[in-house]
């Protein structure tokens, strides 16, 4: 999801089982203002006049404005929106972040189980967990150091396979946490990895999927940004790559892929949260992921790519760069999206909206989905926005990790069964 947060922040050391100390958001509120006929420009004016940051910025009538308000601006803001509908997403954002960032301890060498999904975790604990998980299933999986981030962190991946051995079937590739603050995507992609491994030869549908595809799961595509959200700014989005001549670091990695790179769905301003970079594909992590995906494609091709995001409860298809163009495979993409959403909803009743990226959420240039479909020629290329629709937004309580994983797995299994069926 998109926003324009840019605060100066304090750093703190990451310690498992400790409450982390990022920038103090105590007293900040997050308020949703649904736009209606005639008030879009007024809501935009309030945001500009009070110099407020947004999690969602309203561009048209009917879109929600999810607005972050510092304590000093709350009286003015509430006066300005008097008479408008509003919903409090976070009464005290600092308290919500404090509750979310109390990590449960994880000891390397522990046999992973469902308890991992009771809490969010530090970057280093994610590496230990993935290696421990793979260690339980050595004959049909491998832990892969897929490459290094700009700051030298490991970009981890799990590679899973069934009958026929590794690299013998078309690949499924899942990406999580390309946007640093979207922590639920890290946990949900790991839940799917855990389920595909632990339920193989127990659950017939999962066994069939693992036997029919090579599965590659990259839970932390943007490790530098992810680590930064745990030490300095919980709401950071981009990577941490410096921008020469600019005071603001980072580029939005999902605006940096070398396809339809320039357009209104990205920014040339290094301080923007949707900064596309100085050149197409110049992000350190994007270079790593392009190289990995090309390598995987060279084996038996890529049957499906899914880039997991939050928040919004959406499951979307190409294109992001255009709201009018459609790929030749549009009907198949829409069919599979509906199958995913229906199966997901059957688990906990969570509704998902489906459709093309541009017309469903907003216009995007240089995104992974369009690049994978048009440049790498992946057969099916999709993206999701996981829970929720805005009640908690990016700061999703830990008690929603497990239900998010359960319903996303159900949707994914149903969708991949349909792919196998043809």
Curated annotation (Swiss-Prot):
Cofactor annotation comment: Binds 1 zinc ion per subunit.
SUPFAM superfamilies according to UniProt: Protease propeptides/inhibitors (SSF54897), Zn-dependent exopeptidases (SSF53187)
Enzyme class, UniProt record, top EC level: hydrolase
Localization: Secreted
InterPro entries membership: M14A-like_propep, M14A_act_pep, Peptidase_M14
One of the record's GO molecular function terms: zinc ion binding
Binding residues for substrate: 179-182, 237, 254-255, 310-311
Keywords associated with the record: Carboxypeptidase, Disulfide bond, Hydrolase, Metal-binding, Metalloprotease, Protease, Secreted, Signal, Virulence, Zinc, Zymogen
Disulfide bonds: 248-271
GO cellular component: extracellular region
Domain of life: Eukaryota
Keyword Signal tagged: yes
Amino acids binding Zn(2+): 179, 182, 309
Functional description taken from the UniProt entry: Extracellular metalloprotease that contributes to pathogenicity.
PANTHER family named in the record: PROTEASE FAMILY M14 CARBOXYPEPTIDASE A,B (PTHR11705), SLL0236 PROTEIN (PTHR11705:SF143)
Name of protein: Metallocarboxypeptidase A
Name of the gene encoding the protein in the UniProt record: MCPA
């Amino acid at each position: 999801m998109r926003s324009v947060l840019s605060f100066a922040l304090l750093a703190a050391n990451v310690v498992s089982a400790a409450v982390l100390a990022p920038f103090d958001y105590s007293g900040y509120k997050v308020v949703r203002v649904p736009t209606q006929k005639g008030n879009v420009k007024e809501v935009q004016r309030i945001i500009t006049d009070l110099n407020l940051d947004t999690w969602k910025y309203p561009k048209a009538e009917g879109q929600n404005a999810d607005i972050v308000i510092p304590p000093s601006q709350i009286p003015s803001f509430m006066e300005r929106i008097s008479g408008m509908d509003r919903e409090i997403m976070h009464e005290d954002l600092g308290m919500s972040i404090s509750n979310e960032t109390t990590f449960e301890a994880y000891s390397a060498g522990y046999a992973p189980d469902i308890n991992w999904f009771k809490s969010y975790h530090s970057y280093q604990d994610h590496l230990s967990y993935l290696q421990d998980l793979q260690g339980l299933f050595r004959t049909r999986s491998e832990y892969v150091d897929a490459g290094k981030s700009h700051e030298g962190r490991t970009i981890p991946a799990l590679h899973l396979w069934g009958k026929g051995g590794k690299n013998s079937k078309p690949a499924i590739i899942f990406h999580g946490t390309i946007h640093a603050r979207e922590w639920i995507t890290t946990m949900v992609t790991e839940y799917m990895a855990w389920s595909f491994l632990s339920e193989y030869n127990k659950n017939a549908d999962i066994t069939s999927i693992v036997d029919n595809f090579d599965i590659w799961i990259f839970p932390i595509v943007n490790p530098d940004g992810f680590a930064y959200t745990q030490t300095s700014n919980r709401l950071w989005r981009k990577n941490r790559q410096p921008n020469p001549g600019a005071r603001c670091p980072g580029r939005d990695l999902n605006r940096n892929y070398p396809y339809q790179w320039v357009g209104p769905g990205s920014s040339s301003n290094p301080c923007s949260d949707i900064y596309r970079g100085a050149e197409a594909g110049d992000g350190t992590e994007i270079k790593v992921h392009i190289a990995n995906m090309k390598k995987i494609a060279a084996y038996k091709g890529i049957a499906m790519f899914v880039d997991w995001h939050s928040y919004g409860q959406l499951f979307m298809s190409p294109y992001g760069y255009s709201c009018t163009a459609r790929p030749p495979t549009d009907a198949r993409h829409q069919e599979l999206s509906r199958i995913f959403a229906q199966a997901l909803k059957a688990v906990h009743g969570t509704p998902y909206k489906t459709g093309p990226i541009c017309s469903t959420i907003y216009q995007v240039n240089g995104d992974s989905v369009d690049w994978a479909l048009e440049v790498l020629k992946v057969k099916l290329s999709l993206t999701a926005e996981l829970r929720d629709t805005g009640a908690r937004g990016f700061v999703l309580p830990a008690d929603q990790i497990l239900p998010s994983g359960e319903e996303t797995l159900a949707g994914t299994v149903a969708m991949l069964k349909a792919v196998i069926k043809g």
